[in-house]
Amino acid sequence: MGIFGMFKSNQPAGDENPYTLLKMKQGSNDAPTIDDMYKALELLENGQTDYVSLAQLNQEVDIEVVQAVGEMGMFTVEALPSKNSPEKGKIYYKEHLDEYSMQHYFHAYFETGKVKGLESFEVRKS
């Protein structure tokens, strides 16, 4: 399964309405609030989940998914371009982040659909 394949949701098949999806090991939420996002990040910070992903699907955004992994106070944030982007296939990532930096990237993405400072992220091909 590709990275985008794990973002299956409860949205009806063929539904092209924009929505936000919060996903982690424990499950997913098709209509998360900012509080839901912070609770998911707290689970990651406490080692109670392996990852947290936030996707803005069916929207006109350059970055479709932001995800985080990590443990013991050190996290990696990845930003994945949308399927229609010329940047498709690249993974932007920033390593060795503390919990506050990780929260900052997720908060900005939740509110604006953009990853602040993306130009300072490293890049690899998926």
Residue ranges, per PLM feature:
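Acidic, proline/glycine-rich low-complexity IDRs
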Residues: 2-126
